[in-house]
Amino acid sequence: MLFCATLSVAQTNYYTTSKTFYENGYTYRCDLCASRFLDLYNVNNKWIGQFPSYKSTGETFVMPDAGIQLTTHASWLENKEKVKNIVNAAFTAAQKQTIANQDITLTMYINTDTGKIDDVCFTFLNNEPYAYIPVSVYRNIELAIKENVQEVLTDEGRKLNFIYWWTSVVPK
């Protein structure tokens, strides 16, 4: 007779409700929608819930259908790769295996005076594997992006108070 035993490790879904995480030196907020999508972000973020506007008039910026280039294409391509590498490096091999080809969406808020990233917001479903990743991992991603990513802005981009930049990444 052959006996087979499996080890089952309990996992914690950290993001089952809207709540605030008081961590070691930082605070994160999880806002959960009825759709089960959630936004996870540092409470010190200044642009969450705001819309980009023109510095000179305060008028809300709306991207036209034809598009307007707000950053240079070269810097966007370079920084997209940097963000992908930062996200890839943040997760352990076991976490990547659990995530298994599912993407995570990052919304970054670009400072139009410096080109640096001011704020980062993570969006995912609260029943996806990302919901089992502790806040500290997302904090490390936020800090690495803020330290290593800087966009080259166009003249049009510099007219705004900030620029949205979102991307989806599948950790490999």
Residues of each region from the PLM?
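N-terminal signal peptide c-region/cleavage motif recognized by signal peptidases
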Residues: 5-7
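Charge-biased low-complexity segments
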Residues: 11-172
